[in-house]
Amino acid sequence: NPLMPNFQWLPVGYHGRASSIDVSGQSFKRPLGQTMAPGADAPSFGPSKRMDYELEIGIWISRGNELGEPIALDDADDHVFGLCLLNDWSARDIQAWEYQPLGPFLAKNFATTISPWMVTLEALEPFRAPWTRPADHPQPLDYLESADNRQRGSFDIRIESWLQSAKMRDANQ
């Protein structure tokens, strides 16, 4: 499906619950939901058969702001305590059925796992890189723009993940 016109203009987020966040290595129940098999006349209900995860970077917020008061981009780093690795788990078969037109809901709110380690922004400072936006993309609106952020840059962090099954672990692979 083509991206909606607002994709390049608005930050994208998903619904989740703080109660579904746990430390990596914890087990969780496979989510239940509706799925629609190819060629089926009606959806069925049951456990997800297509589990997946997205490796992401989690941000730990150190202090808040007054309700309804935005935080200026130039002040945002002062509110961040550190970063961690985060696995955003998804039930892709449930998501395929429920995501249009409003986006995933039950397919993405059942589990999020985070690393037990956190890295401070101070430790990441040597990894800042110039921030640029592709010429064919619209420039951000003023409230999403900061000359200081452009000058300081963003963090150039590259992450990879590998999946290792119990069978692979037993075989030392």
Which role fits each region the language model picked out?
Residues 1-172:
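Active-site microenvironments in enzyme catalytic cores
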